[in-house]
């Protein structure tokens, strides 16, 4: 694998994601009617036996819980692909309530840092036509912390927002199947820069979240409501997000630290 430039990292991710297979089948429970040892001729046979003997419970159908499971699987897959890059790429995994889910660097990208965040969205199913939108707006960023103050190193981040050469989202779009233990049908992975799928609306009425466009084809084509990244950042950094007491205290602390840090450090 040779040097990967910023646009090519996005294409590299797209290529890898084409080969991702959603193979989560349920939650294993020890209790069941199996007479051990169990013998299976292939994976599908094993799955069927575990299901028939009561060992396979359904994954959660609640969107946030299911998304967490799917995100872990996708990050694991990408980490395996990065590990197979022959040292061209390296990666660090984020934690819970952390941005990004995956930080990519390495000699293949000139030692620069790239933020790769995983988003999961359910298709909005209607009786009249095939799905054309997500059930709700994907959250691109938390608008009142690291995004609004990109030179500060906020808790829950590897480094300041502005230190990244590029921000990329891997978006998993699926149809919920309530009748299977895996819960997921027709998973599609889309890789886009967040600003290219940005809308002018929040993704929550109660939280300070920046929302994406709803249209599935708009997500695929990177057809958001902003013509340029500069327009996206200008609009959302001027947005009147609420800043609660906890966030305000943290902001004041970070600003004080920045003032005390000598230039060049």
Residue ranges and their predicted role:
Residues 102-103, 116-119:
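A generic, well-ordered mixed alpha/beta core segment in the N-terminal half of proteins
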Residues 1-98, 107-111, 120-265:
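Nucleic-acid endonuclease domains
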């Amino acid at each position: 694998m040779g040097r990967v430039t910023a646009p090519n990292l996005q294409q590299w991710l797209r290529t890898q994601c084409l080969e991702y297979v959603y193979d989560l089948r349920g939650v294993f429970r020890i209790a069941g009617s199996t007479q051990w040892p169990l013998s299976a001729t292939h994976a599908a046979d094993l799955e069927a036996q575990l299901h028939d003997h009561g060992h396979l419970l359904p994954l959660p159908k609640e969107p946030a819980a299911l998304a967490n499971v799917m995100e872990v699987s996708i990050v694991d897959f990408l980490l395996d692909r990065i590990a197979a890059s022959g040292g061209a790429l390296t990666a660090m995994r984020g934690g819970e309530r952390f941005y990004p889910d995956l930080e990519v660097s390495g000699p293949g990208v000139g030692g620069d840092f790239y933020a790769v965040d995983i988003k999961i969205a359910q298709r909005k199913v209607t009786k009249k036509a095939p799905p054309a939108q997500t059930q709700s707006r994907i959250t691109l960023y938390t608008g009142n912390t690291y995004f609004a103050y990109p030179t500060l190193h906020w808790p829950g981040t590897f480094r300041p927002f502005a230190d990244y050469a590029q921000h990329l989202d891997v978006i998993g779009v699926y149809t919920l199947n309530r009748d299977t233990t895996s819960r997921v049908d027709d998973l599609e992975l889309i890789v886009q820069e967040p600003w290219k799928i940005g809308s002018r609306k929040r993704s929550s009425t109660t939280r300070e979240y920046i929302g994406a466009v709803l249209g599935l084809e708009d997500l695929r084509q990177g057809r958001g409501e902003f013509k340029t990244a500069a327009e996206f950042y200008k609009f959302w950094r001027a947005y009147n997000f609420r800043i609660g007491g906890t966030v305000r205290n943290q902001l004041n602390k970070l600003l004080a630290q920045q003032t005390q840090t000598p230039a060049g450090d």
